[in-house]
Amino acid sequence: MKLNISYPANGTQKLIEIDDDRRLRVFMEKRMGQEVPGDSVGPEFAGYVFKITGGNDKQGFPMFQGVLLPHRVRLLLRAGHPCYRPRRDGERKRKSVRGCIVGQDLAVLALAIVKQGEQDIPGLTDVTVPKRLGPKRASKIRRFFNLSKEDDVRQFVIRREVVPKKEGKKPYTKAPKIQRLVTPRTLQHKRHRFALKRRQAEKNREEAAEFAQLMAKRVAEAKQKKEVVKARRASSMKK
């Protein structure tokens, strides 16, 4: 079985193949999300604590959280479920998924380091991979750099260097477009939008008042016409 070990603190991961089933016995019958000590896996993992995050069986079917079985099942999946991406709105599909209990039929078991042990694992805990992209939303940039509302967020955007594929061209930097950035222009647009809304509401009120007056006038005219007809009919009956 292969162990795909990730270390989220450093952003690294490493695939380790283990042939001895006795070293893997500690993971058997465990469920996804459970924490397992790594002392029995090998001397290099002494003191480490792993969390089981997933895995695949030998045919490539992924483990599904919540299915308390050590074998494969067919589930009706919809949008929002793991292991399925719908192609249309409201589409559902029955797909084969592996239960969340670890067994011998797994080809790869995904683990995350929860607690680091005594010695470093080469290529995993002794290396740090920096994040490729920084925060994009204005509030998250403020939180990341501990800025106040008075500070200009645009000065703190993390730029990344792009190396062009063509030879002889200089590398250049790219920055993401800041989302939800409050500027004088956006405030002006907001004021303009509210002014249009207010103007439209006033216009609707005036038109409604005019229509009510017109309806009252028409009702009064119809009532007057009825009274005239009634009076004419009464006078003709007297004759």
From Swiss-Prot:
UniProt subcellular location: Cytoplasm
GO molecular function: structural constituent of ribosome
Pfam (any one): Ribosomal_S6e
GO aspect biological process, one term: cytoplasmic translation
Keywords (A to Z) from UniProt: Cytoplasm, Phosphoprotein, Ribonucleoprotein, Ribosomal protein
GO cellular component term, pick one: cytosolic small ribosomal subunit
Function statement: Component of the ribosome, a large ribonucleoprotein complex responsible for the synthesis of proteins in the cell. The small ribosomal subunit (SSU) binds messenger RNAs (mRNAs) and translates the encoded message by selecting cognate aminoacyl-transfer RNA (tRNA) molecules. The large subunit (LSU) contains the ribosomal catalytic site termed the peptidyl transferase center (PTC), which catalyzes the formation of peptide bonds, thereby polymerizing the amino acids delivered by tRNAs into a polypeptide chain.
Additional facts recorded: There are 2 genes for eS6 in S.pombe.
Assembly with partners or alone: Component of the small ribosomal subunit (SSU). Mature yeast ribosomes consist of a small (40S) and a large (60S) subunit. The 40S small subunit contains 1 molecule of ribosomal RNA (18S rRNA) and at least 33 different proteins. The large 60S subunit contains 3 rRNA molecules (25S, 5.8S and 5S rRNA) and at least 46 different proteins. Interacts with snoRNA U3. uS11 interacts with MPP10. Component of the ribosomal small subunit (SSU) processome composed of at least 40 protein subunits and snoRNA U3.
Similarity-based family: Belongs to the eukaryotic ribosomal protein eS6 family.
Protein name from the UniProt record: Small ribosomal subunit protein eS6B
